[in-house]
Every structure is written in structure tokens, then in C-alpha cells.
């Protein structure tokens, strides 16, 4: 059977029907020490221009189940063009319109949840976007990303979180066109980033906490068989470690899929521990896995620009 990107994993995730005991797990923050490189290398003008284009060795869609890494790269570029996109800004409103327009063009029917978040900076208007793709059975596979950027001067967030937003848009393009065994929902969260400089609860994960609470009230939270979060997945030297705060069974499954596809060099077995949007759901008993490379030297710096993004990396993550 020829499966679209993520289909192997989505089918396998649907088998994880056993309830998960309620956990309290530890946007995006790692226990590992990371930071910007002390000195940026000197790069020629030609090299800089080339870095603004998709990689020549990006695998074609026919090799990645239909996922088009170059299309995803273009989605990253479009987000970067809007500039810094912190929650409540004019730029994030433009991104919201872009996401909604793209989803509608794919035949998806996006739902928008507009809400007001209480933050250290006062009330901020935010929006979650959710696509519900029907399936033949009631179980739900939830794919997710955040689309806001950290409020830092000149921070355009090509990787954090332009890359994962682009991956989810490309998956929506493929998945909205067909009906699967289980429902697939794709969520775009606002407000993952802390408003203050430091990540401290409750100043983070505004959008994912909002959605998890609403789904708990509606009863849909109990129908989620697996929650797959992507965040910071576009690096040219992508290395995704196993998150100790993700469900072990689901992590094992994803890493096995990656190995079988030949991506063991990207999905590595080194451990890490990440605080991210997945914990809004894992603390409510949902099986979750976080796909993220937080050990990038340009994390939360103005150097998180389009030239750091690899269309090949986007294709690899989308394929898995």
C-alpha cells in the first residue's frame, strides 16, 4: 500500500488505544544547555543567496510519500517575509490569514478559536486554528505546531516555529484530500512562547492549554489516541533527540518508523527533556511525542533566519 507522509505512523498510532495514566510532565525549553554561537562564520554573498533557496538534494515528493519539502520551504519563506510574529501583533494576524487561506485552498475547513489570554503584559488576543479531517472510526490523531514567535527584536523565527508550521501546512495539503481510518486533526497554536524573557509557568503554552481545556469539556480529548507535536524541525544539521517528557511507546514507534525509512541520522537515540505544547495534553492523560531540535546555536536569536532552513530536513520530518 502506498502511504502518504505520516500515514505509516498515523495507522500505527491508532493502535495505541490503551488509556495512558494521568501524568504530570516537565514552550519550548530544554534541560540541556544551549546557546548562540560566539562568532558567526564569514559567508560569501553567493553562499547567502544559495541559502535562501531549497536544497538541491531535497528528496522529490515521490520519494517521501507525496510530501514536498520545497513547497514547505516556500511556506517558511512566506512566514519570514511577515517579519517577527509575536502573539497579538499585526504580523501574526497576517500569518493567521495566510494559514487560513492556504488551508482553504487545500479543501480543508479550518475552525478558528479566538480567545483572550491573561499574560504578564496584560490581555492579548490570540487565535488557535484547527482542521478536522474525517475518518471512518471515532479515534483522533492530533498533529500540532505553534506559529507564534518569541518577542525579541528582529527575531523572524524561520526555524522556531516557521519550520514546523510549514510542515503542518504541507501535511494538511495531503491529508485533507482523503479520508483515513481515523480522524486526523491538525492544530496551529498561538501563544506557545512566554511573553516574558524567561519560560516560567503559567507564562507559556497559552494556545495549547486553551485547546486542551476546550477538548476536555467537549469530550473529544478522550478520543485522542496520539498527539504528535512538531517544533523547530528545519535545521541544516537536524538532530532530533528522544524527549523524556514524551510517551515512551509513542516515541519508540516514531523512532522505529524513522529508522525503517533510513533517517536514523536525524532521529537519534540521545536523550533530552523538553517543555513544550505537548505537556498541555500529556498532563491530561493523552499520549504525546515532541519532535524538536532545540540544540540549534541560533535559538531565540535574530540569527534564526531563512538561510538556516533545509528543505531536505523538512521533507524528512514530513515523511516520518
Named regions from a protein language model:
Residues 29-31:
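Bacterial signal peptide processing site
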Residues 78-136:
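A non-catalytic alpha/beta surface segment that caps or lines the substrate-entry region
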Residues 65-72, 85-96, 140, 157-165, ...:
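Solvent-exposed, acidic/flexible segments
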Residues 151-253, 262, 270-273, 278:
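Acidic/histidine-rich catalytic neighborhood of metal-dependent amide-processing enzymes
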Residues 24-27:
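C-terminal motif of bacterial Sec signal peptides marking the signal peptidase cleavage site
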Residues 63-66, 112, 116, 226, ...:
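Active-site-adjacent substrate-binding region
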Amino acid at each position: 500500500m502506498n502511504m502518504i507522509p505520516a500515514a505509516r505512523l498515523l495507522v500505527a498510532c491508532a493502535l495505541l488505544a490503551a488509556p495512558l495514566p494521568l501524568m504530570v510532565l516537565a514552550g519550548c525549553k530544554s534541560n540541556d544547555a544551549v546557546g548562540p554561537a560566539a562568532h558567526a562564520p564569514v559567508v560569501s554573498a553567493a553562499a547567502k543567496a544559495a541559502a535562501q533557496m531549497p536544497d538541491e538534494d531535497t528528496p522529490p515528493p515521490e520519494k517521501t510519500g507525496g510530501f514536498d519539502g520545497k513547497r514547505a520551504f516556500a511556506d517558511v519563506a512566506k512566514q519570514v517575509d511577515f517579519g517577527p510574529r509575536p502573539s497579538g501583533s499585526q504580523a501574526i494576524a497576517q500569518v493567521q490569514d495566510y494559514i487560513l487561506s492556504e488551508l482553504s485552498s487545500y479543501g480543508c475547513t479550518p475552525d478558528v478559536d479566538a480567545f483572550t489570554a491573561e499574560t504578564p503584559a496584560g490581555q492579548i488576543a490570540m487565535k488557535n486554528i484547527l482542521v478536522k479531517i474525517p475518518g471512518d472510526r471515532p479515534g483522533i490523531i492530533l498533529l500540532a505546531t505553534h506559529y507564534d514567535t518569541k518577542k525579541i527584536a528582529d527575531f523572524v523565527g524561520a526555524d522556531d516555529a516557521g519550520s514546523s508550521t510549514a510542515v503542518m501546512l504541507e501535511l494538511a495539503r495531503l491529508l485533507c484530500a482523503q479520508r483515513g481510518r481515523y480522524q486526523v486533526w491538525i492544530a496551529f497554536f498561538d501563544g506557545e512562547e512566554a511573553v516574558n524573557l524567561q519560560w516560567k509557568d503559567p507564562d507559556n503554552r497559552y494556545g495549547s492549554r486553551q485547546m486542551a481545556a476546550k477538548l476536555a469539556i467537549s469530550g473529544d480529548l478522550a478520543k485522542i489516541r496520539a498527539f504528535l507535536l512538531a517544533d523547530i524541525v528545519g535545521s541544516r544539521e537536524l538532530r532530533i533527540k528522544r524527549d523524556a517528557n514524551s510517551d515512551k511507546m509513542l516515541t519508540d514507534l516514531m523512532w522505529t518508523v524513522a529508522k525503517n525509512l533510513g533517517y536514523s541520522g536525524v532521529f537519534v537515540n540521545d536523550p533530552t527533556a523538553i517543555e513544550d505544547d505537548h505537556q498541555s495534553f500529556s498532563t491530561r492523560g493523552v499520549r504525546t511525542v515532541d519532535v524538536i531540535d532545540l540544540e540549534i546555536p541560533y535559538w531565540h536569536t535574530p540569527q534564526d533566519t531563512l538561510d538556516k532552513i533545509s528543505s531536505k530536513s523538512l521533507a524528512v520530518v514530513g515523511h516520518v
